[in-house]
Amino acid sequence: MRIPFLLIIFLPFSLPLFSTLKPKNIIVLANSNETDSKALAHFYCQHRGVPTNNIVFLSTSSKETISWDEFVSTILIPLRESVIKQGLIKVIRKEPSDAQGKRPYQIINDSIKAICVCKGIPLRIKSYLEKVSALEAEYAKKIPEKLRKNEAAVDSELAILLIKNTPRAGFISNPFFKNQNSKDKNYEKKYLAVTRIDAPSYQNAQRMITDSIATEKKGLIGRAYIDNGGPHQKGNQWLKQIRDQLYEIDFDFSVENSRRLFQQNDRFDAPILYFGWYAGDYSGVFRNHRFRFPPGAIAFHIHSFSASTVRNPKKQWVGPLLEMGASVTLGNVFEPYLEFSHHPHLFMKKLIEGCSLAEAHLYSIPVFSWQSIALGDPLYRPFAKDLDQQWADRDLIETNSYLLLRKIQKTLNEKNYNEAIDLANSHFFEHPSLALGLKRAQIYYELEKPNMALNAIQFARHLSLYTTLEMGLGNEIAQLAYKWGDFSLALGIYNNLFQQEALTNEMAKAWLPEGISLASRLNHFDLSDKWRRKLALLKK
């Protein structure tokens, strides 16, 4: 941040900070003018064991976008004063004051490591166009013209809450970015990991907390999806690295490499992880009004203005993803330029290592006093339990078919194909599911046993009910049946899909031509005529 203030001298401190992050190390920030904001702060402290003395209430604007004057007078200065007054940061006050009447402080205790910003605190600071000081003007000359911006994310400014004499234009490098050993080489500065619990509704903000806590107990279970068709090689490479990371931890995943995003007719079951770019507004599969993420999901879509609002559930990406049930997301309030936004593969690297959201955020963001934010519980550790621990507790987990998929994937990655099919077979007859049935068929096909592969998907003939997120999975099985020559099975699956309440117009428009072709091929002209009429209505 960007105005000269109190002289602060930091004593050296040791790291890692966040591998030992405790509830007592977190400031919880709320808007005293917002009932929901105050309630959320208490809710978080109650559920995470944060001392209530760590709550700081600020009387600030209820708007998402504020001016620099509002930020300084209603957030920055009151927050500094409050953390000292409440004993959250201990200081030695020195006399006399400087020429501006500001007292220099010496920090003697640095127990606070993170800030949890609650719904109700402003989101971003608009551009400051008035005349700047000579010091700031001189600084601005030293940075590229495109970076001489002073609009910013509130959270990114709070990360440098205790650093003096920072300019408004441009950004400040984050010394913890990619720091393999988490060694702070710049002892005169102290940075805070700032994450935000915010969503379009208070109920969803609460859910972000409770889902995170519940997911930590059982671990992440589901599949991953990557939309990797963005406009720049660097972003595509980042997401490719995430794909490689998922392979290393035996996660089942799907990748869309074209410019199109995953659509409603694509497979998208159990999306516990989603990474994508580069669309300006949420679209594709996320336009299905029935769509919901599983509890604890991590989902983000790289875009310059993905977090220009959090409160609107129908605009950009952050608000809609949280409204649809995500527990963690990343975003940008203004244009950050790609290289200065979160590096998602680094973010995932830390999470996979078992670190908290706070640590992953700090590790993966190259700069502060800029545009990027992280939303979620700072203490959330989605990979706190590894696969072996999850497998040991599998009988206690309701969604264990997707846990089984990961166990099978681990066996396949180790080239133990026979063991993988034995594992799939032994559990399928006890806990049948579309996902597991498809996996059995795919393994048989890889083992060059096409008849057994085809036999493995025959169960789909008898299914009569599909959930919203199973519809695309059903289509994938129908396509395999067609590919492997069982046209009757493929037609039967499509006939079932077309009768589902979960069928959307987008699904129908994508699948009806295939169904019509199959019905005609098998002389079911009543069906083909019926579906032609339906398709014609949809195209009007």
Please name every model-derived segment:
Residues 353-415:
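Caspase-like cysteine protease fold
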